[in-house]
Amino acid sequence: MELIEKHVSFGGWQNMYRHYSQSLKCEMNVGVYLPPKAANEKLPVLYWLSGLTCNEQNFITKSGMQRYAAEHNIIVVAPDTSPRGSHVADADRYDLGQGAGFYLNATQAPWNEHYKMYDYIRNELPDLVMHHFPATAKKSISGHSMGGLGALVLALRNPDEYVSVSAFSPIVSPSQVPWGQQAFAAYLAENKDAWLDYDPVSLISQGQRVAEIMVDQGLSDDFYAEQLRTPNLEKICQEMNIKTLIRYHEGYDHSYYFVSSFIGEHIAYHANKLNMR
């Protein structure tokens, strides 16, 4: 991995790296925050997945997470949201193509050549992190919007690999809302069974489980009713007896003003779970 940026932050280092991804067949950037204690010992890792139109910079520059990661001794890894490059398929819209990888493995041309974000996040990136950084094998996952969807899917499908999962404003029923339906139709065609493999509510209804799910949702979020549908997740978790910490916040929208208001609590939540394991 090539170091391309380095900034001291809260006694640790907010670094940016570039590497060639075998899964995605392109160069990828990834942000890695190393707390002060990483200079002398191995630490657990929190993976953060960002939302539509974002790249690896949004979370590390807007959330203020470095303060809390330093306090709780957690390495934070923030990858990009899709493969990138002039040779990578794209679309003339914000919710498909580059910046909108949906953390799945595409099966349809032209997307299937590069869009293997599920494999990248689950397998390739953790292997790189373990090889290049002072990381323990313990890891948790979180994300925002499309990234919250990705975090929930990865945790539900791989419950033994992630100690804990949380999300801000996640797309919980993508197979039932425009964002998910449009992306799934392009990436996965009309194979509705494949769609359900990337739908948190469907996965839970099929019996996939995690110990607990933490979600924060703003009630002034313009996408809440049409695209996100957090109550669907709350309902299925109640039916399947999955413990949840789902909080609704008056006045908060879909932006990083919302994420930055509660990211400290999410990092503390993951730190507690990681230290218990």
Curated annotation (Swiss-Prot):
Activity regulation info: Inhibited by the sulfhydryl inhibitors (N-ethylmaleimide, iodoacetate, ZnCl(2) and CuCl(2)).
Residues forming the catalytic site: S145, D221, H254
SUPFAM superfamilies assigned: alpha/beta-Hydrolases
Main enzyme class: hydrolase
UniProt-listed Gene3D superfamilies: alpha/beta hydrolase
Keyword Hydrolase part of the UniProt annotation: yes
Catalysis performed (reactions): S-formylglutathione + H2O = formate + glutathione + H(+)
InterPro entries: AB_hydrolase_fold, Esterase-like, S-formylglutathione_hydrol
Keyword Hydrolase: yes
Annotated keywords: Hydrolase, Serine esterase
One Gene Ontology cellular component annotation held by this UniProt entry: cytosol
GO biological process: formaldehyde catabolic process; formaldehyde metabolic process
GO terms, molecular function: carboxylic ester hydrolase activity; S-formylglutathione hydrolase activity
Family: Belongs to the esterase D family.
Protein task: Serine hydrolase involved in the detoxification of formaldehyde. Hydrolyzes S-formylglutathione to glutathione and formate. Also shows esterase activity against two pNP-esters (pNP-acetate and pNP-propionate), alpha-naphthyl acetate and lactoylglutathione.
Listed name of the protein: S-formylglutathione hydrolase FrmB
